[in-house]
Regions:
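N-terminal beta1-alpha1-beta2 module of alpha/beta enzyme domains
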Residues: 1-99
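Flexible, glycine-rich active-site loops centered on histidine and acidic residues
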Residues: 6-9, 14-37, 111-175
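Active-site-proximal glycine-rich helix-loop-beta segment
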Residues: 54, 101, 130-132
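Hydrophobic residues within beta-strands of alpha/beta enzymes
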Residues: 58, 105, 134-136
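Short His-Asn-centered micro-motif
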Residues: 61, 108-109
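Glycine- and other small-residue-rich loops at beta-strand/loop junctions that grip anionic moieties
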Residues: 85, 108, 115
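Conserved catalytic cysteine-centered active-site region
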Residues: 98-107
Length: 175
């Protein structure tokens, strides 16, 4: 293989600001330290470790609301600690950026939860504080509990959410 045709492999860690992400119940294991997800030191240590390991980035997934799709209730998610409770992942990034130089930060943020102006302000601030090391996973939300948490009667239909997202992105580009 010629040097020009070689492709780079990018390595990231996939996290969530919750007791567990895709490994529901692991928080019960005595050696699991994700139970410290609510402490800044946990995230700073993770960022330092990722940078020492030469990873390219830390991606923090997020979902607004508690999983209420299994049996129409949040009981199963809450019992297993499955992505609940969750913290706002954007608030963790500046602490991780402070203790690293090269790691990139990706974060999920829903267009359904913020006004475009406040969203642009928050993400522009993070982009500056990280020296341009911020990426955004754009989502529109999909949990009824998230919609109810925002005072809505129900989650908007899929196509309507994406129509709103298109308008939202148009507004963001102008800001």
């Amino acid at each position: 293989m010629s040097r020009q045709s070689r492709r780079e492999l990018r390595l990231n860690t996939f996290q969530m600001a919750a007791p567990s992400h895709n490994w529901a119940g692991l928080w019960k294991h005595p050696r699991d330290n994700q139970v410290n997800y609510h402490q800044l030191a946990y995230w700073a240590d993770m960022a330092r470790t990722a940078e020492r390991g030469l990873l390219d980035g830390i991606f923090i997934a997020d979902v607004f609301g508690i999983y209420d799709v299994y049996g129409g209730s949040a009981d199963a998610a809450l019992t297993a600690g499955a992505q609940a409770p969750q913290m706002d992942p954007t608030l963790l990034i500046s602490a991780m950026a402070l203790v690293t130089q090269h790691i990139g930060f990706g974060v999920t943020a829903s267009l359904s939860n913020d006004h475009p102006f406040s969203f642009a302000r928050r993400f522009t601030t993070l982009d500056h504080l990280t020296n341009g090391r911020l990426g955004w996973n754009i989502v529109t939300g999909y949990l009824e509990s998230g919609a109810r948490g925002l005072g809505q009667q129900a989650l908007r239909a899929h196509d309507e959410r994406y129509d709103v997202a298109e308008d939202y992105m148009t507004a963001l580009y102008k800001l």
